[in-house]
Regions:
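Generic secondary-structure signature for well-ordered alpha-helical cores
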Residues: 23-27, 120-124, 144-151
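Rossmann-fold NAD(P)-binding glycine/threonine-rich loop
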Residues: 80-96, 105-142
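Short beta-strand segments
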Residues: 43, 129, 154
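N-terminal glycine-/serine-/threonine-rich beta1-alpha1-beta2 phosphate-ribose binding loop
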Residues: 1-95
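A secondary-structure boundary/capping signal
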Residues: 10, 103-104
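Conserved small/polar residues in nucleotide/adenosyl-binding loops
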Residues: 151-157
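A short hydrophobic/small-residue beta-strand
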Residues: 99-101
Length: 157
């Protein structure tokens, strides 16, 4: 079975929630997409910081280039917040044909059109969801948004 490789940008309250939700819904995601979901990288500001969840099985990095240069990453999930440098990271992710899911309202308020146009040009998905309940909508974006669109799931197969 193929893997769906994910990079998570941020491991605060929402990012920790995303990790928990992905772990709790791993089988549902696998059944829906017929792929094993793997959190391959997690970008954090400080890899030595104590975390509220067990992250021993995950690769933490402070270097965005590890994610951008990893051709195996299918989806970048951004929950760091802020506009700069986040918008640059999302633009570069889209340019490298990585699907993007974000919960960043501030960034979208300023750069939504730019990111949507870039996603369309690259043939990848840009999904945005509110971060209610620490990440639940992220699973909806993975299951429904990427699975329901032939155009976008072809890149995941």
């Amino acid at each position: 079975m193929k893997e769906l490789n994910v990079a998570l940008l941020g491991l605060g309250t929402v990012g920790s929630g995303v990790v928990k939700i992905i772990e709790e819904n791993r089988q549902q995601i696998k059944d829906t997409l017929n792929k094993d979901i793997v959190i391959k990288h997690i970008l954090v500001r400080d890899t030595t910081k104590k975390r509220p969840i067990n992250i021993s099985q995950y690769h933490l990095t402070e270097d965005i280039n590890e994610i951008l240069n990893d051709d195996d990453i299918d989806i970048v999930i951004e929950v760091m917040g802020g506009i700069e440098p986040t918008v640059d990271w999302l633009r570069e992710s889209l340019k490298r044909k990585k699907h993007v899911i974000t919960a960043n309202k501030d960034l979208l308020a300023v750069h939504l059109e730019l990111l949507e146009n870039l996603a369309e040009q690259q043939g990848v998905a840009l999904k945005f969801e509110a971060s209610v309940a620490g990440g639940i909508p992220i699973v909806n974006a993975i299951n429904n948004g990427l699975n329901r669109s032939e155009e976008h799931t072809s890149a995941l197969q």
